Design a protein with these regions (language model features):
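Conserved short C-terminal alpha-helix that flanks the catalytic cleft of nucleotide-sugar-dependent
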Residues: 156-157
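Ribokinase/PfkB-type carbohydrate-kinase core domain
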Residues: 1-44, 49-97, 128-129, 137, ...
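Short, small-residue alpha-helix embedded
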Residues: 53-56, 107-137
């Protein structure tokens, strides 16, 4: 519930803890206004194109306007996934765009967005990136998080089920396949 989310965010703020949020379309459609109010306390937001459009009330065809609106609502990083087209990330100062890693054998897209979101947050945590204010992020850390997230999503769609293909830290670190990704 959004009442509980508000309490969690208050406590996180009191403890100086970063909060990542990946709301579902159902949560967005049921409590858009409440969620918008909560964004001021969110450090990392991960949504897909449709969720970003629902949240902002702006068609994702106007991508720059969507990011401008989201950046104005929250202090942290916004990542908008675009399925097989990749991701766009804004830290309020820079916008990063990346495609996906080539899939060896796509089996099941279930959980790909969640795999991306968890990989993205893991990448930020691993680099100790906080980004509590717009424009304070280290671009190298954002790019690392995008690469880890994309690798995690790619590995996940190559296995059946939502979690079977998730990468371990070791499998990401040792895989030559995921070392280079074009990020503009």
């Amino acid at each position: 519930s959004y009442k509980l989310l508000g309490k969690v965010l208050q406590e996180a703020k009191r403890l100086n803890v970063s909060v990542a949020l990946n709301p579902s379309f159902k949560h967005l459609s049921e409590g858009r206004r409440e969620l918008i109010k909560s964004l001021k306390d969110i450090s990392f937001l991960v949504v897909n194109e449709g969720e970003a459009a629902t949240l902002t009330g702006i068609s994702f065809k106007k991508e720059a306007a969507v990011f401008k609106r989201l950046d104005s609502l929250m202090p942290g990083i916004v990542a908008v996934t675009s399925g097989a087209k990749g991701v766009t990330v804004s830290d309020g100062r820079f916008v990063y765009k990346a495609g996906i890693f080539p899939e060896k054998n796509m089996v099941d897209r279930t959980g790909a967005g969640d795999a991306f979101g968890s990989g993205f947050v893991a990448g930020l945590l691993r680099t100790e990136e906080v980004c509590r204010e717009k424009g304070t992020c280290d671009p190298k850390n954002i790019e690392y998080a995008i690469r880890l997230a994309s690798a995690n999503a790619t590995a996940n769609v190559e296995r059946l089920g939502a979690t079977e293909g998730l990468l371990t830290r070791s499998s990401f670190d040792t895989s030559k396949r995921f070392r280079v990704m074009k990020i503009t």
